[in-house]
Amino acid sequence: MKLKAIELKNFRNYEELKLDFHPNLNIFLGQNAQGKTNILEAIHFLALTRSHRTSHDKELISWSQQEMKVSGVVEKAHATVPLEVQLSPKGRIAKANHLKENRLADYIGQLKILMFAPENLELVKGSPATRRKFMDIELGQIHAVYLYDSMRYNRALKERNAYLKFDKDKIDKNFLSVLDGQLAEHGNKIMLERQNFIDKLEVHAKKIHEQLTHGKENLKIIYNQNVKTDFSKELLSRQDHDIFRHQTSVGPHRDDLQFFINEINVADFGSQGQQRTVALSIKLAEIDLIFEETGEYPILLLDDVMSELDNHRQLDLIETSLGKTQTFITTTTLDHLKNLPENLSIFHVNAGTIEQEQ
């Protein structure tokens, strides 16, 4: 899978922009706050219809404009697929092959991406919400049905939480049980998919982590399900508690992940270097896992992470990705990028203008 070209209209600081990409490696070079990350954000938006930097869509639209559009051409093994995502006061429209997709689950996965940004280093030591988002994004690209169940679960969760905010004497437990059934139906599928994903991810990540640490460290990933027994029974047993607290206290929306090196919890006791190595091992593992599950390698987006990694980890990242994935890198300097291949494109970014090095 390759992204051949992208076109932006009123996206962030780009009023009009068209770029053709190298099928192997693309580097965006420039000082901070010039618009490098905006390009990777646009690719992320084209793939997932969402930004990785903000949940406020209005921030993506250029100043004084009312709408924006990101379009691109994706080259797959047996087809070339034009993609387009628009934002306007009327909402969001996603198109594949010039046809509007009414369901997000039918669009996501057309362009598979793997984003590695400084905030991804928070995967190990950040909040549980960060790790749940990680599972949701990656699984949503691999299995469309997961995205469908996740959306249905979140809709039911929102409805149940809103109902729990009613006065206690106005709550009908029979209706609450109906909502419980909807949560359990989709929540059970989510938990099963997450467990299968983590089991497979761990297999790949363990091998990579062992290579990165020269056999000195053994990585283990634990999926901590919030639901310990039967989801339906736990929801029923907690109804009074949830009515009192005005929120749903059990379910996959409270799941988490834990990472261990040689039986030591990395988040609590690992060094910063160990935490970074775990995050890197997981990202590199995803490359092969996505290919294993879908038959397509994802596009790799490296947003200013090279400066966060030492030379050894930089080399491991580049060597693992090149030859498999089309890679996009943003950086302020090429000094720390060693052993770059000759077949690449370098784009110089300055104040929202981009020039390709000849």
UniProtKB/Swiss-Prot annotation:
Effect of V74G: In strain: ATCC 7962
Residues given in the record as ATP binding sites: G30, Q31, N32, A33, Q34, G35, K36, T37
Superkingdom, natural source: Bacteria
Coiled coil: none
GO cellular component term, pick one: cytoplasm
Disulfide bonds, paired cysteine numbers: none
Single GO term (MF): single-stranded DNA binding
Pfam families in alphabetical order: SMC_N (PF02463)
GO aspect biological process, one term: double-strand break repair
Subcellular location: Cytoplasm
Keyword line: ATP-binding, Cytoplasm, DNA damage, DNA repair, DNA replication, DNA-binding, Nucleotide-binding, SOS response
Stated consequence of mutating F291L: In strain: ATCC 7962
Main localization of the protein described in the UniProt heading: cytoplasm
Function per UniProt: The RecF protein is involved in DNA metabolism; it is required for DNA replication and normal SOS inducibility. RecF binds preferentially to single-stranded, linear DNA. It also seems to bind ATP.
HAMAP family per record: RecF (MF_00365)
Family to which the UniProt record says this protein belongs: Belongs to the RecF family.
Protein name: DNA replication and repair protein RecF
Lineage: Bacteria, Bacillati, Bacillota, Bacilli, Lactobacillales
Record gene name: recF
